[in-house]
Structure formats: structure tokens, C-alpha cells
């Protein structure tokens, strides 16, 4: 299912788009999580959705299903990179069991020295096995490398405004199967139709999901400290701390703090962990 507007569900199959409605028990139990962008569905001859197949994953904000990658896109300059937001999006990806990648656009704005400095600041990504791509949509640098990486996958893009997401999507997409404006016209909703996540076919194969849903992202609904720690890969691949239930905050003999002191774990990542734990402690209490 590639798009939903006012009760109509647009399903792509073999290069065609079908305007569908929910049927039977699906219609009776309809809610915002019932049939979402990315769902694999079965449709009947009368264009009714009769079955929604089991999901690989489900993002809650934005609401999309069966995603392979979360592409976290930022600009090297104008606006400058928000490292805390990168960490929040990484946390979100790990929480929903979606593979993250980081894309930095506008590298043509940087001097050689600034580019070296940027790579150093983002070196923590390699330590946690997150691929990074440095691109310039304006100068067509690095775009084909990302396209080949995302080929035949379903990718949702997250990041702030002004970082070139539209230019990047325009490079990736094939001719749109059915534009939002065309759907709006058919439904006589006009150009002001509220648009949620929209699934766009890529010319190399696969889909890119354009969504406004990351604008108000928050810390996910993590249930306890152990779960939070599990979402920081760099905390897991080191020797055990002195205490089995170490919080990595106050305890002596903490190997996470030792790794931070030795610059083997990013201090910014560790500070983000502490800040997130504080937020969650307030939530849990």
C-alpha cells in the first residue's frame, strides 16, 4: 500500500495503482494502524483490501510498515548538523529494528579541512556499523553510490527541513505511478489534501518513503534501562562491567565509562545516553 487519503487506499501491483477500500472485518476494526503505507496486502476483483499480511516492522511516528532502511539525512552546512537529532533517529531505528544509514548532503560547501573534521565527528558511525554517505545533490556527488545501496529496498527518510531531501528523492525516483495531486483531483479534495507518508518508486528498484512524520520525533517507548542499553551497540561489544546491572553512570569499574575516557566510545553518544536515561526515568516514575 503506497498511499492513503480520506479512506481510500492506493495499492501498487505490477506497475499499476488500484484505488481500494477496506472490506469486512478490516473495515469494522479500522484504525490508524490497521492498514498503513508499506503494508503488503491482498485485493479482490472489486478493489477491496481483504487481507493485510504480517509485518516485518511497524514505525509509529511516522506510521509506516515493512521498512528496510531509515535514511537519516542532514546537511554538512546550512543548516549545520544536529548531532543530538542524529542520535535520536539512530535510537529510533534500533528500537524498531530497522537498519539506519546516515546521508550528509551539501559536502560541496566544505573545504578539505572541514570535510576531514566532519568525517572525524561522524567516525562513531563506523564503530556501530552504520553506513555513511557523503553526497552533493547540486554537484551530483555520491548519489549513484547511495542509489545502488538502496536498490530493491524500502527506505524511509528522516531529517530536518532544508537538507535537500526533495532533491535527493527527485534523483532516486522513477516517474511517479500516481502523483498525490492526481489522487486529490480524483477525490475532489483539491490541492490542500492532507498528505501522510507517500511511497515513491525508485528508478533503480525499490521504494523511498517521503514523510513529514519525523518533524516531532520523541524518545521511543522504551520500557526499562536494560532495553535502553541494548539500543547502544557500542556498549554491548566490550568487556563486562564490575557490576552485572551497571547503569554506566555512577558505578565504579564501569567499562563503558572507561571506553569513553579512552575515546573508544564517542563522548557525544555517551552524553546522549545519559540524557535519554534521565528523560526515561521521569517517564517511568
Curated annotation (Swiss-Prot):
One GO MF term on file is:
GTPase activity
GO CC list: cytoplasm
Q: Which cysteines are joined by disulfide bonds?
A: none
Per the record, the GO terms for biological process are:
ribosomal small subunit biogenesis
Which SUPFAM superfamilies does the record cross-reference, listed alphabetically? Nucleic acid-binding proteins, P-loop containing nucleoside triphosphate hydrolases
Where GTP binds, per the record, is at 105-108, 159-167
Q: How does it assemble?
A: Monomer. Associates with 30S ribosomal subunit, binds 16S rRNA.
PANTHER family assigned: SMALL RIBOSOMAL SUBUNIT BIOGENESIS GTPASE RSGA, SMALL RIBOSOMAL SUBUNIT BIOGENESIS GTPASE RSGA 1, MITOCHONDRIAL-RELATED
What the protein does comes down to: One of several proteins that assist in the late maturation steps of the functional core of the 30S ribosomal subunit. Helps release RbfA from mature subunits. May play a role in the assembly of ribosomal proteins into the subunit. Circularly permuted GTPase that catalyzes slow GTP hydrolysis, GTPase activity is stimulated by the 30S ribosomal subunit.
Protein name as catalogued: Small ribosomal subunit biogenesis GTPase RsgA
Q: Provide the species name.
A: Fusobacterium nucleatum subsp. nucleatum (strain ATCC 25586 / DSM 15643 / BCRC 10681 / CIP 101130 / JCM 8532 / KCTC 2640 / LMG 13131 / VPI 4355)
Gene name per UniProt? rsgA
